[in-house]
From Swiss-Prot:
Residues holding Mg(2+): E120, E124
UniProt KW Cell membrane keyword: no
Family according to the record: Belongs to the Nudix hydrolase family.
Chief place where the protein resides: other
Higher taxonomy: Eukaryota, Metazoa, Chordata, Craniata, Vertebrata
EC annotation from Swiss-Prot or TrEMBL: 3.6.1.-, 3.6.1.77
Organism superkingdom: Eukaryota
Encoding gene (name): NUDT19
Motif window: Microbody targeting signal: 376-378
Enzyme class of the recorded protein, top EC level: hydrolase
CDD domains: NUDIX_AcylCoAdiphos_Nudt19
Domain Nudix hydrolase, chain residue ranges per copy: 7-258
Cofactor(s) this protein cannot do without: Mg(2+); Mn(2+)
UniProt source species: Gallus gallus
Record-given protein name: Acyl-coenzyme A diphosphatase NUDT19
Length: 378
């Protein structure tokens, strides 16, 4: 945790992809042999109520506990590889770059945020992403799902889930009980999103969220919503999720929509796993979407876009607003260097990117939910 932060809180989330071979995809984007886990937030939530999101939540002091060092390997970063220096003109996301020692934790942020994402996945969805012993899993493919017979009886596991929800420190006790550790090595660093100033939830809630990607061989056998923060769960391929969003079956916030468009580049779980593993040590930068209000909608500008400010107002203290009387279509015709999400209404989103992706990452497919041409190029 970072108690020095005043304008947002730190969080972690995981894009959990599970193999689904032989499935049929009705999407015009084509077949896909894996599914993602989506959780529908409660309608009573103070932040993005009823939205379909990836598992995750706020980092807690227990995620940074020195006690984890008794379970995890003693190697530097608990066996995680060292992220390479950022490219020229780039920067390491502060979320990961912050030295946690002066903040009272010997556990690196790269480890603690993974523990947070794994703990939250158990709290919200009942899924345990654990590995045996205190060493990285051998093998280069997607991680195996923890078999049901290796878990505790359902009633006992449910009681542990309730305890962890009430006290995150109990997650370490659960791992000790099972003789397993959080499978931090299965989570690959993927992206980092900071809530825009003008899109804060009730009480001005903003989050600096680490997004990880985790590929599992098969869907876990024990998924269930908690009926507290989470009202329902859904397993869906990225193309199908976009179709559901387009038909207003589900609602996705812009970061989730963007990441789905990026995942639509991968129809194979093995290809996705290899890509995420190969580029994970490249790291990522923090993205703060900056909102430009147009006459008929909004444009969320992302780093690299020609209209993205040189000095973004990260805290909101400058009270800077960007607005124009021009229509979105006119702004698109006038521009040439794009990294943006166009928002006409809650179910009308379009991603436009024609810049080179940094950190050896993949640009999203440029998808406009108002168009049937999903692979549109500018």
């Amino acid at each position: 945790m970072n108690p020095r932060l005043r304008h947002w809180r730190e969080a972690a989330s995981v894009l959990l992809a599970a193999g689904a071979p032989g499935r049929r995809s009705p999407s015009p984007l084509g077949p896909c042999d894996y599914e993602l886990l989506f959780l529908q937030r409660s309608s009573r939530s103070g932040f993005m109520p009823s939205a379909h999101v990836f598992p995750g939540g706020l980092v807690e002091a227990a995620d940074f506990s020195a006690e984890w060092l008794r379970l995890l390997p003693a190697a530097p970063r608990c066996g995680l590889g060292a992220v390479r220096p950022p490219p020229p003109g780039g920067s390491r996301a502060p979320l990961f770059a912050t030295d946690r020692q002066p903040l009272g934790s010997p556990l690196p942020g790269e480890v603690a945020f993974r523990i947070c994402a794994i703990r939250e996945t158990f709290e919200e969805a009942g899924i345990l992403l654990l590995a045996p012993g205190g060493r990285p899993r051998e093998g280069s493919g997607p991680a195996p799902s923890l078999p049901a017979e290796q878990l505790l009886p359902a009633a006992e596991l449910g009681e542990w889930r309730r305890r962890v929800q009430e006290d995150p420190a109990c997650f370490l006790q659960l791992c000790q009980r099972l003789g397993r550790v959080p499978d931090i090595w299965a989570l690959q660093e993927w992206s980092n999103w900071l809530t825009p100033v003008g899109r804060a939830g009730r009480g001005g809630r903003r989050y600096d969220t680490a997004f990880y990607l985790c590929c599992l061989e098969t869907r876990p056998p024990h998924t269930s919503q908690d009926n507290q923060e989470i009202a329902a769960f859904l397993w869906s391929s990225p193309p199908e999720a976009i179709e559901r969003f387009k038909s207003q079956e589900i609602w996705l916030a812009p970061p989730q929509f963007y990441e789905l468009c990026r995942l639509c580049n991968f129809s194979s779980l093995n290809d996705l796993h290899k890509f995420s593993s190969d580029r994970a040590l490249e790291g990522c930068e923090r993205w703060l979407p900056v909102t430009l209000t147009a006459a008929d909608g909004f444009i969320q500008l992302l780093p690299g876009d020609e209209l993205y400010p040189e000095d973004p107002d990260y805290t909101g203290e400058k009270k800077i607003t960007m607005s124009t009387d021009k229509m979105v279509e006119d702004l698109m015709k006038e521009g040439s260097v794009f990294h943006r999400i166009v928002i006409k209404n809650t179910h009308s989103l379009a991603v436009y990117v024609n810049i080179q992706a940094k950190y050896k990452h993949m640009n999203p497919l440029m998808i406009n939910t108002d168009s049937s041409n999903y692979n549109s190029r500018l």
